[in-house]
Amino acid sequence: MIKSSLILLSGGQGTRFGSKIPKQYLPLNGTPLVLHSLKILSSLPQIAEVIVVCDPSYQETFQEYPVSFAIPGERRQDSVFSGLQQVSYPWVIIHDGARPFIYPDEIHDLLETAEKIGATALASPIPYTIKQRNPVRTLDRDNLAIIHTPQCIKTEILREGLALAKEKQLTLVDDIEAAEIIGKPSQLVFNKHPQIKISYPEDLTIAQALL
């Protein structure tokens, strides 16, 4: 069993959600949203340390958990880089605080695949017809996927990829793209359970129904 560090990204402002409080700190069934995933992740034997990337004003939210903190950056990759400075294990799991649902069997699958490949992300097949906008044409959805977190990547690959992104002034849209840009392989692990990211108020209602 490989040991990994967890970087929990909880620094977003949730502008699409339209709340004065960042969405990851809003209550879901009486508990701050971000703590739903942290409760499960921090209990897993594969996770040896937790780094929470958040604004210092919200650190008190995590007082019941043995975590360290990092300051969020302007972009997602900057926040990941900030958390990465405290990582002390050869593998990193990265998760969004706005995604409350975590399943231990999927973490096992991610880590098992990452150990063989180097970088993995949780994903779902696309059930809809997908079209390119300009020019309009239909895309083969069988070759596309919806990407979620957690994502798992070898620490040295993540460091190298983020360094190259900084050098080339690239913006990465997810974490395993750090492997892609340095020519390292990655693989998707398809989810077995419902996945939802809280982006809009109605998503909280859906999440409540799934609890």
Curated annotation (Swiss-Prot):
InterPro entries: IspD, IspD/TarI, IspD/TarI_cytidylyltransf_bact, ISPD_synthase_CS, Nucleotide-diphossugar_trans. Keywords: Isoprene biosynthesis, Nucleotidyltransferase, Transferase. Its EC number is 2.7.7.60. Pathway: Isoprenoid biosynthesis; isopentenyl diphosphate biosynthesis via DXP pathway; isopentenyl diphosphate from 1-deoxy-D-xylulose 5-phosphate: step 2/6. The keyword Plastid does not apply. GO terms for biological process: isopentenyl diphosphate biosynthetic process, methylerythritol 4-phosphate pathway. SUPFAM superfamilies: Nucleotide-diphospho-sugar transferases. The record marks R141, K197 as: Positions MEP for the nucleophilic attack. The record marks R16, K23 as: Transition state stabilizer. HAMAP family: IspD. Catalyzes the formation of 4-diphosphocytidyl-2-C-methyl-D-erythritol from CTP and 2-C-methyl-D-erythritol 4-phosphate (MEP). This is 2-C-methyl-D-erythritol 4-phosphate cytidylyltransferase. It comes from Chlamydia pneumoniae.
